[in-house]
Every structure is written in structure tokens, then in C-alpha cells.
């Protein structure tokens, strides 16, 4: 079902047209006060400057009120109390323990917070779908993802990992959408891509992040076709092949595949910030693989561009733009980027990569084990 305002938030003329249609619908409610004892109006967003509710000015907005923070969704106490038979069926069907089933449900569907004081909230649609089908799957994103929002994220030209996991916002900015083009964080919060992860009492702002693995996978699955010329079965094959090669220590094979993937990317997406674009590609791909990946990982003597940890290998990747892989590898060694991982039982693989702004692709790399 199309959402008249949210679906057209990037189209000012249509947004105003729909606003004018919706306004009298809500205005009629105020004239029905004597017939209505209690009414709850729900939706994704409040458009404060659109004046849809200007005539209906006696509403009490409880969107971020801690007293009502758990009014929607299912908290963990409720799930463990009321869904135990379904959780056990899920565990039995997939041949893992009850506790592991709970952990997987939590990892995939928990993590929403809608106010400063709020218990962990599970996505009810996804949780109940998983219990009914006895399968940990991605159910919420089957309902669709707004492409304009994904494109807006990419065109910010920012490091995706930090943008999606280290956002800060005050309650005023999160409460309503003024213009998606100037700040898309409120839209991402209100549509469920970001949620409250903490509160800075001294400075009065919320810390935001991705709620859970289902949202993360769905978001990145939507971003991947925009980052590279790949989708559908080809994307699945690439992810499977990449996972296998990195688990086996075949960094050269992975980088060759990535080079082929990036060859089809248009200049419109990469623009002038090619290095950030490449880092974002790696971050999205490795997150979809399920690996522990961090970009701009800080050490005592510098910053690792990309750090990937698989069960058997720790990959340290340094990116250079219009330089050489030798220079990139020399930086890894001179700054001793491997030092924090020397006690790790996994093999350390250092990779120096050169990225060309002319071709918008990686041109050469050196690997040192």
C-alpha cells in the first residue's frame, strides 16, 4: 500500500497536493468531540510544517513518551512468557537448543527503543512470522524499501559504518520531518532503519544505531544494487563466493572478484569521493557476509582503513588513492597496524590496495601474510 506523504516526500508538489487532501479528513474529527471518548492516530511520521493537524490541535503526541514506549511491539518478557511453545518448535525444527533459538530471535528482531526509557522491543511482524514459519528470515523488508532514502544515504558521501552506527540527534529533530533532503536521519528513525541506542544526559541527545540484523541485512541488500552493478542471483553468487574465498584465505581471488564488480559502477554514484565509495562497498559486502568488519579502525599509531575478522584470518586493508599498493603496504608495516592482533590465534593478512579515481576501481594490490 502506498503511503501518500512518505512515498512522495522527495516530490514537493505532490506532497502539498496530498496534504491538502488529508487535512480536511483530520479536521472533521475535532467536530466529533462529543462522540469520541478515546482515539489513537498512528502512522510513520509527523510532518510538522505541513499543517495537516493544524485544525485538530488537541492531540497529545505520545510518540516518544517513556510511559507509552512499549505500547507497540513485543518486549522480551512478553515473548518468553507467551511464545515459549513457538520458540521450542522453532528450536526443534532447526535442531538447536531453546536458548539458542531465543538468542537468534533477539539478534534478528529485537533492539528497538522509542523513548529515553524503553525496554527492548521486538518487531512483532517479523517475530511472529519466524515462529509461525519456524524459520529465521527477513520478513519486514518483504514489504518494500524506499529507494529514494537509500540513494540519499549514498549521496551524502559519508562513511556508512559511522553514519549508521554513530548518529546523534535531539528529541526535536527526531519528532518530525521537515525536509528529507537536508536531514534524512529523522526519516530513518521513524521508518525503523535507526533506533535509540543510548542517551547523553549531559548534552541532551540520543545515540542512534541500526536495531538488529534483519534491518541491517535488508538495508544493505537495498544498498548493494546502488553501490555496484549487481542484484538478484548474481549478488547472491558473489556473496557466497566471497565468503568462501575469505574463509579460505584467498584474498587475491576476492579482490579480483571485487574489481570485476566495481567495473560496472557509474560515475554518478562514485563522484569525487571514490575512496569513501570503495570503503562503503567493502563495508556493505562484508556485513552481508556476516563477518566482523570495521572501517577506520583506530590503533595507537594510526587508523586502519578496513579491518575484517573471519574465523581463521584477520585482514588488514590499507587503501591508497592514485598511489601504489607498495605505499599502502608500507604504511601498514611502518605504523604496525598488526600490533593489536599479535596475540590473536588467527593468521594476519596485510593488504595494500591502490584505488584509481580515473577508473573508479582498484588497479593493483599487494598481499603479505
PLM regions and their residue ranges:
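Phosphate-binding site recognition
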Residues: 1-274
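Switch/connector loops and helix/strand junctions flanking conserved nucleotide-binding motifs
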Residues: 4-6, 48-54, 325-328, 358-364
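Mg2+/Mn2+-dependent nuclease catalytic core
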Residues: 15-20, 321-338
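Metal-dependent nuclease catalytic cores in nucleic-acid-processing enzymes
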Residues: 25-32, 186-194, 283-287, 291, ...
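Acidic-basic catalytic patches of nuclease active cores, encompassing PD-(D/E)XK
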Residues: 260-294
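Conserved catalytic cores of phosphodiester-cleaving nucleases, focusing on short active-site segments
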Residues: 282, 304-321, 335
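Active-site metal-binding core of divalent-cation-utilizing nuclease and nuclease-like domains
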Residues: 285-311
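Domain-level recognition of nuclease-like catalytic cores that cleave nucleotide substrates
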Residues: 340, 344-369
Amino acid at each position: 500500500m502506498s503511503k501518500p506523504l512518505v512515498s512522495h516526500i522527495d516530490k514537493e508538489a505532490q506532497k502539498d497536493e496530498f496534504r491538502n487532501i488529508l487535512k480536511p479528513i483530520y479536521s472533521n474529527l475535532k467536530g466529533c468531540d462529543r462522540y469520541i471518548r478515546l482515539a489513537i492516530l498512528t502512522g510513520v511520521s509527523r510532518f510538522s510544517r505541513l499543517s495537516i493537524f493544524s485544525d485538530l490541535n488537541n492531540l497529545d503526541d505520545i510518540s516518544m513518551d517513556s510511559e507509552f514506549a512499549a505500547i507497540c511491539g513485543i518486549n522480551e518478557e512478553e515473548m518468553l512468557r507467551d511464545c515459549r511453545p513457538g520458540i521450542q518448535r522453532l528450536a526443534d525444527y532447526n535442531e538447536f537448543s531453546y536458548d539458542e533459538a531465543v538468542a537468534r530471535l533477539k539478534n534478528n528482531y529485537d533492539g528497538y527503543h522509542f523513548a529515553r526509557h524503553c525496554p527492548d522491543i521486538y518487531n512483532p511482524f517479523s517475530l511472529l512470522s519466524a515462529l509461525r514459519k519456524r524459520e529465521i528470515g527477513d520478513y519486514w523488508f518483504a514489504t518494500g524499501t524506499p529507494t529514494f532514502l537509500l540513494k540519499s544515504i549514498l549521496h551524502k558521501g559519508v562513511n556508512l559504518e559511522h553514519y549508521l552506527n554513530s548518529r546523534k540527534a535531539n528529541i526535536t529533530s527526531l519528532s518530525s520531518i521537515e525536509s528529507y533532503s537536508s536531514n534524512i536521519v529523522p526519516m530513518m528513525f521513524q521508518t525503523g532503519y535507526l533506533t535509540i541506542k543510548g542517551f547523553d544526559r549531559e548534552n541532551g541527545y540520543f545515540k542512534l544505531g541500526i536495531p538488529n540484523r534483519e534491518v541491517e541485512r535488508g538495508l544493505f541488500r537495498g544498498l548493494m544494487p546502488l553501490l555496484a552493478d549487481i542484484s538478484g542471483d548474481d549478488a547472491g553468487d558473489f556473496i557466497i563466493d566471497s565468503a568462501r574465498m575469505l574463509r579460505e584465505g584467498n584474498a587475491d581471488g576476492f579482490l579480483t572478484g571485487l574489481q570485476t564488480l566495481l567495473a560496472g559502477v557509474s560515475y554518478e554514484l562514485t563522484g569525487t569521493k571514490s575512496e569513501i565509495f570503495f570503503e562503503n562497498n567493502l563495508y556493505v559486502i562484508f556485513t552481508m557476509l556476516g563477518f566482523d568488519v570495521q572501517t577506520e579502525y583506530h590503533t595507537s599509531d594510526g587508523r586502519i582503513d578496513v579491518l575484517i575478522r573471519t574465523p581463521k584470518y584477520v585482514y588488514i586493508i590499507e587503501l591508497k588513492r592514485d598511489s601504489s599498493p607498495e605505499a599502502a603496504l608500507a604504511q601498514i608495516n611502518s605504523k604496525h597496524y598488526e600490533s593489536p592482533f599479535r596475540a590473536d590465534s588467527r593468521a594476519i593478512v596485510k593488504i595494500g590496495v591502490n584505488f584509481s579515481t580515473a577508473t573508479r576501481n582498484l588497479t593493483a594490490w599487494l598481499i603479505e601474510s
